[in-house]
Swiss-Prot record:
GO cellular component: cytoplasm; ribonucleoprotein complex; ribosome
Designated name of the protein: Large ribosomal subunit protein bL33
UniProt KW keywords: Ribonucleoprotein, Ribosomal protein
Molecular function terms from GO: structural constituent of ribosome
Gene field: rpmG
Any one biological process term the GO annotation gives: translation
NCBIfam families (UniProt xref): PRK00504.1 (NF001764), PRK00595.1 (NF001860), rpmG_bact (TIGR01023)
SUPFAM superfamilies: Zn-binding ribosomal proteins (SSF57829)
Highest taxon of source: Bacteria
Length: 64
């Protein structure tokens, strides 16, 4: 009998200010990978994390 897939999925968090801000320390967009439980957190995830391109803590949103 086949085992069911788990509820945990791998997601990517992308800096929201790197996409819009031109005045930053270095070019590029910062991305983090993490996991989330699909059953408990159905909405898109938003976390404040450090962005080395902006050189400060910014909001990182979940992307597809």
């Amino acid at each position: 009998m086949a085992k069911a897939k788990g509820a945990r999925i791998i997601i990517t968090l992308e800096c929201t200010e790197c996409r819009t801000n031109v005045n930053k320390r270095s070019p590029g967009v910062n991305r983090y990978t993490t996991t989330k439980n699909r059953r408990n957190t159905t909405a898109r995830l938003e976390l404040k994390k450090f962005c080395p391109h902006c050189n400060r803590h910014t909001v990182h949103k979940e992307i597809k």
